[in-house]
Amino acid sequence: MTQLTNFSESFSNQNSNLHQPYNFNSHQPPEENHYYVREPNGKRPFPVEFELDMEYVPRTKRRFDKISACLENFSISNDKPSPINICRESSSDEEMDEVYDDSNFDQCTESTSIPLVVEPDDEPAVAKKIRLDESIQRYFEKCRQGPIDFLPKPEKLKGNEMVIWQPRILVSPKNDFNMAGRIQEIDDEEEDRVNEEIKTRIIENEGMIDEDTRNETTGIVELGTGSDHSDIGSSWSSPMASPTGSSQIVELDPDSPNSLTNGSVTDEEMMEFE
């Protein structure tokens, strides 16, 4: 172990001799058997006056305290600032336990508050009035002297009036507790009629009733047939041939031997039709 330690010490000394600073701005090439290392530039040094107080404080905490100190006397309201925002300590990690009395509050507000500056108006108060045209001024003066003719006036009925104007009384629904005219009672017959209308509308909206097929018709549903022609008068005609295995609805004449009304259809065919 002793020899290994001595060997390592001699090796480190040898490297220290080879390691020399080199001016990278010079145009002279480096000498042989020497290597040069550029020392990295460190971060910007922290201000010395804050090193003692903020040595063990995280960066986020320091940033928070710095911004809080800048916004200590800042207020966006015109109200009197509270003593918590003005006379609080600069460090935010200590909680304020004592309550300031009125004397300390007045001293803080007098020293830190900024007086409000009231700027005078550039124009006199007369300029803020509305300036009217001469014709409008004459019209207003005429209306002051005599009553306006086109406005309705309370008079007795003469009997030859065409339309009697009655002012409408505006009543707020919030102040009107009388529900007359808003709620209408119905009897049992009216309730049944309304329920039937509601059921009909629901069925029509769901597509269970078609307006074109309200008339009762007789027909046979042929399942699994691939024929392109029908017996008599198909209710659905298309220039394209129906594909194999599709269903087809065919209307039949009542005199046809396969009609549903003449009794020639068996029970099995009726079950297939259903």
UniProtKB/Swiss-Prot annotation:
Residues 29-38 have a biased composition (Basic and acidic residues). Residues 1-38, 222-274 are annotated as: Disordered. Residues 18-28, 239-249, 256-265 have a biased composition (Polar residues). Residues 1-17 have a biased composition (Low complexity). This is Uncharacterized protein R107.5.
